[in-house]
A protein has these predicted regions:
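ABC-type nucleotide-binding domain
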Residues: 3-174
């Protein structure tokens, strides 16, 4: 029976992982990665080389063909999918903002967050400086697609949203 991942420390290890979407056509072969708590770790490579697939495997959207993925010294398969996914904060390349204020967009994952917590998350994401220059600061209403914000500003807002949840492990997909 799967157990809850509580108080994650942030250690992630891929041990000789193989994966294929189509049988007999390996996409990833013998992948070995070790990331310790507090470590910054970057996967770099051309589009289509498997970076996002590794994230999907880590979050158990797909099962691996061989090897093991360990989180805090235990197989990721030992944890419930829901508790495993709660341990991670993720910002994708494609941003998602909704119609509402800047503060509401940042607080999306933590609706009970205080204004001070929202501002602190924005500062940690390096978004505070541009937010306070907006006509109404954190109370500026933005459209569903992010309005006139640059792609970089949209990503900073999404990073602030994740920072507010204070995940044990932060994943940034390009």
């Amino acid at each position: 029976d799967a157990v809850e991942l509580t108080a994650p420390q942030g250690e992630v290890t891929f041990e000789h992982v193989d994966f294929s979407y189509v049988p007999d056509r390996k996409l990833l072969q013998d992948i070995c990665i070790e990331a310790k708590p507090g470590m910054r770790f970057a996967l770099v490579g051309p589009t289509g080389c498997g970076k996002t697939t590794l994230i999907n495997l880590l979050l158990r959207f797909y099962d691996i063909d061989a090897g093991r993925i360990m989180v805090d010294g235990r197989s990721s398969r030992d944890y419930t999918r829901a508790s495993l996914r709660r341990a991670f904060g993720m910002v994708l390349q494609d941003t998602w903002l909704f119609e509402g204020t800047v503060a509401e967009n940042i607080a999306y994952g933590c609706p009970d967050a205080t204004r001070e917590q929202v501002i602190e998350a924005a500062k940690r994401a390096h978004a505070h400086k541009f937010i306070v220059q907006l006509p109404s600061g954190y109370d500026t209403v933005i459209g569903e697609d992010g309005g006139t914000f640059s792609q970089g500003q949209k990503q900073l807002l999404c990073i602030a949203r994740v920072m507010l949840t204070d995940p044990a492990i932060l994943l940034l997909d390009e």
